[in-house]
Regions:
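Short beta-strand elements
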Residues: 239-256
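Extended substrate-binding grooves/exosites of carbohydrate-active enzymes
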Residues: 1-160, 165-185
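Intrinsically disordered, low-complexity Pro/Gly/Ser/Thr-rich segments with frequent PxxP/GP/PP motifs
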Residues: 175, 179-244
Length: 256
């Protein structure tokens, strides 16, 4: 009755109710199928059998501690399965606040740091941003990479750009290509690539004066031994309300 009340009074909004997965008598309550923390394989199998509704993870990829490592399995599934609508990460910001430890050093504290017993200890530290100034954690870098709408695959002497955006051409960004040797930048180029939305294109890597691992003459005879990394990035051309010019929106890497 409550779901029908919502639909009558605001037909512009979808109705979500996770509980239908536990009692199918109320299946019409929710406009979408929803679960917390099923595996990507479970979602794929479910949608192969039941395609009556889109599937949404109302909570997934719990971002506690050293986590988010398997997130790509879900974002890969969004590319493969049109009925899978993604999910909501738990959660965005660590529930932690600054306080001084026993040595007088200011640190981010959580359960148990304030003589609070019993408590859940670090269970509140489950965000992709730290508490305090909301600085990004390493988990945020993983999330950003998995959510980027432009993917770059680097081969021996070329790279393929897959533009997953629905409306944005990659020409709206600058494409930066850098070569590093053992972490030190030794060559760089900025170019403009126009890959239409929902399409892909392959390009050759630059022919820098510095002999590279993909030089055509002797492909693997390089000037110096070490780890060569080529990075192809797409960055903002101009300042926006949410980020400055040069902010990276997508990247891909190849290691030689």
């Amino acid at each position: 009755e409550m779901s029908e009340f919502y639909r009558r009074n605001d037909p512009t909004r979808l109705v979500h109710y996770e509980g239908v997965c536990n009692d199918r008598r109320y299946n019409d309550t929710s406009d979408m199928e929803s679960r917390m923390y099923p595996s990507a394989a479970y979602v794929r199998d479910f949608l192969q059998k039941d395609r009556s509704k889109p599937y949404l993870l109302c909570e997934y990829t719990h971002a506690m501690g050293n986590s988010c490592g398997g997130m790509h399995k879900y974002t890969d599934l969004t590319d493969e399965e049109p009925l899978f609508q993604g999910g909501f990460i738990w959660d965005y910001i660590d529930q932690s606040i600054y306080h001084k430890d026993r040595y007088g050093k200011e640190v981010l504290g959580y359960g148990g740091d304030f003589d609070d017993r019993p408590c859940d200890y670090n269970f509140s530290g489950n965000g992709i941003a730290y508490g305090g100034e909301r600085m990004p954690s390493p988990k945020m870098q993983e999330v950003k990479f998995n959510y980027q709408n432009i993917s770059i695959t680097i081969e021996k002497d070329s790279f393929t750009v897959n533009n997953k955006n629905l409306f944005t051409n990659t020409a709206d960004y600058d494409c930066q290509i850098t070569l590093t040797l053992d972490g030190k930048r030794i060559a760089a180029s900025t170019i403009e690539l126009a890959v239409e939305p929902l399409s892909q294109q392959t390009y050759q890597l630059p022919r820098w004066k510095y002999q590279t691992p993909w030089s055509t003459e002797e492909p693997w005879k390089v000037t110096a031994a070490g780890e060569y990394v080529v990075t192809v990035s797409f960055v903002l051309k101009e300042d926006t309300l949410w980020a400055k010019r040069g902010h990276e929106v997508a990247f891909g890497q190849g290691i030689y």
